[in-house]
Amino acid sequence: GLQLPYAEVLWREGDDGGEPLLPRPLVQALQLNGGAAHGADPRDHRTITPQPTLPPQAHGSELPVQRLSASAYEDLRRCPYRFFALRQLGLKEADELEDEVDKRDFGLWLHAVLKIFHEALAADVTLGDGLAARLALMEQAAAEATRAAGLPDAAFLPFAAAWPQVRDGYLQWLAEHEATGARFGWAERWQELPLGSITLVGQIDRLDQLADGSTLVMDYKTESIGTTQGRVKTPTEDTQLAFYAALQPDDTLQAAYVNVGEKGGTKTVLQPDVVDVRDVLITGIRHDMERITSGAAMAAAVRLAETPEM
């Protein structure tokens, strides 16, 4: 191309990440030798009047909320428009068939294992607190949960490799937990509570009775311990435990996340002052439902609007 009497050479001055890009050495050499000159930009410059598009101002007063779960209320707190779209309009993404087992599948499986284990342990008083018997019972529960879930052996291998550490860490935590006088109450039970014109609903992972007679509401987590601790760093910003506490007619209860880790063992992360946080949450729910009924705009939160999900 350089043999022609005239040639136009174009190059990018920056990449997609904003980093500057220099022309190729050949082009730089031509510029230094006077063999190339910057051409004039042939594009016409135009002044365009901005015409911003306002975010949607949805109103949910014609779609009354009758049942409210912890995850639904979390949607409302994070992004009212998301709540309107998913919970009131019922818009959902089409489900995709996946043959890979992910962390969520492992979490569901673990919930099932612990439910089977604790119910069997509570039903057989002869087992006591012997570690060998509990290990055998936990393995039976794992096998039963795997069969019920229909999980393929090959796909489950990564989690199967981590299971012994998870199991042993949990049993050690359980022994320490029971040493305080705590006793298993029930697991995976659906709860409902009328609140004005709506009904609060949810399935609580586990409820124990403590030595002083009070109740401990628990929710299992398989995430990193730092993530779990971050949930309770600002108590009033955590929806889940306070919501589950609202489903229990008890003013002396406690609530905690039980982080079932693969490497660091199982740890309890208490939600401090959960009764006070629960009362604040209930007040907030009443207020928010009244605003929706009165026609308040369901605005989109910018931080979520940047990642469309509808």
Model-predicted regions and their roles:
Residues E8-L10, G14-M310:
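RecB-family 4Fe-4S metal-dependent nuclease core
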Residues G1-Q3, A58-H59:
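Conserved short internal alpha-helix adjacent to the catalytic or cofactor-binding core
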